[in-house]
Structures are given as C-alpha cells and as structure tokens.
Design a protein with these regions (language model features):
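C-terminal engagement/docking regions of AAA+ P-loop ATPases
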Residues: 32-117
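Phosphate-sensing "switch" segment of ASCE/P-loop ATPases
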Residues: 1-35
Length: 117
C-alpha cells in the first residue's frame, strides 16, 4: 500500500461529534484568559494551543485508531496524542518554571481538568 492510499484511508476514519468537541475543548482550555479556562492555565501559561491543535488531535487520533485496528477514534486516542500535539504549542511562563512546572505537567493537569463527553 502506498503512502497516498494510507493518507486517504486515515482521513476516512470516522470521529464521533463528542470526540471532536473534546479535542476542541482540550485545545481551547490551554489558552489563558478564555472563558472556562482552568485557573492553573491562567497562572502558568503565557500562550496556549490554537484550533489547529484540535485538528491534529483528531487527525492523529484517526491514524492511531487505524494502526490499532479500530474503525473509529476514541477519547483515549485524543488523550494519548495530547502531549505530542500540544507540547510545542503551549508556552509556560516564569511563574510555572519557578514552581517546577513543565509543559508536560501542564498537559497532564489539562487532561485531568477537561472531561470527556
């Protein structure tokens, strides 16, 4: 199977609306000073992920589902890709560094704060 065919196949994997909304909420919750943003984001993050992050959470979820032999994307696919997708899109501030926080710590807390469904 060639790369182009795999690419087309990945894009055809269906995603439930609630999983899409979860990916969007996860990316949006990483942005400080937005409605519904967790307090720790406002305290420790200077810059959060944009909407493109949600798109890549879903696209990566499609590839992960296909590689796992599943025909649809799950919340766990999105959660598993949160760190690789969000890591370079979240900029922590000096307060976070002083508190010993890392981007990975922030993403872990974000996954706890943003509920599935």
């Amino acid at each position: 199977m060639d790369i182009q065919r795999i690419h087309e196949l990945v894009r055809k994997v269906p995603v439930a609306e609630d999983v899409v909304r979860y990916a969007v909420r996860l990316a949006a919750a990483s942005r400080p000073k937005q409605q519904g943003t967790p307090d720790f984001i406002n305290e420790y993050v200077s810059w959060g992920a944009g909407l493109r992050a949600a798109q890549y959470l879903i696209l990566g979820g499609k590839a992960r589902a296909l590689l796992s032999g599943r025909a649809n994307v799950t919340w766990e696919d999105v959660r598993a890709l949160a760190a690789p997708v969000l890591r370079h899109r979240i900029l922590i501030n000096y307060r976070a560094e002083a508190a010993g926080m890392t981007v990975e710590t922030i993403i872990g807390r974000l996954l706890e704060a943003v509920k599935e469904g």
